[in-house]
Amino acid sequence: MQLSQNETNVDAYEVPAIFTSLDLELNQPSGKIIQIGAAVGRLMTGDILETFSCFIKIDEPLDEQIIKLTGITEFDLASGLSLEEGYLQLASIHIKHKAFMNPIVWGGGDSLAIRHELESRDPDFFKEHNFCFGRRWIDIKTIYQMYRFANGLKMQSGLSKSLGRFGLQFKGKKHNALDDAVNTFRLASKLLERLKD
């Protein structure tokens, strides 16, 4: 899937309408990706247009603590996709909706983790396939912390507690990449309302 720059994202100088919220679950201690979750939608309205989730096959045992934390099992991973297949499906959805190039994340680095792991598996992967995301990301955790700081409030907060402080409940299961991506999108939309002049 080789795409031109115009196909991979919207113009960086336009006000973007659609964003991709991205979340990963990782095995430990290796940090290998075991699940990709994404929600694509209109941030100004909070409308989610499409979601995506897949488990990723890995070549190592799944850590017991990660099984307890995420509920992901060896069976889930065995029936999953390769990271390459998972990325290409994610990229297809991101591009189809012409989402802004920088994904929304909780805590930063998820898009970079995908890129680095793909490059470590196949240094030529991005010679055949464009990377669908930009070099940056929109870290909702940091923006939320600055919002709290500006209002003289405690800055430390997890995703679920942060949603609660805006009158929202966490939907789904914590440490599920899709549910975390959807809830990060919901918080980003609510936070955007509060930041408008």
Language-model regions, residue ranges each:
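Charged, flexible boundary elements
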Residues: 1-11
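Feature recognizes metal-dependent phosphohydrolase scaffolds
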Residues: 2, 17-18, 85
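Metal-dependent phosphoesterase core characteristic of DEDDh/y 3'-5' exonuclease domains
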Residues: 12-18, 29-34, 40-70, 96-197
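Short hydrophobic beta-strand that contains or immediately precedes a catalytic carboxylate
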Residues: 20-23
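Short polar catalytic/cofactor-binding loops
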Residues: 25-27
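Metal-dependent phosphoesterase signature
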Residues: 69-90, 94
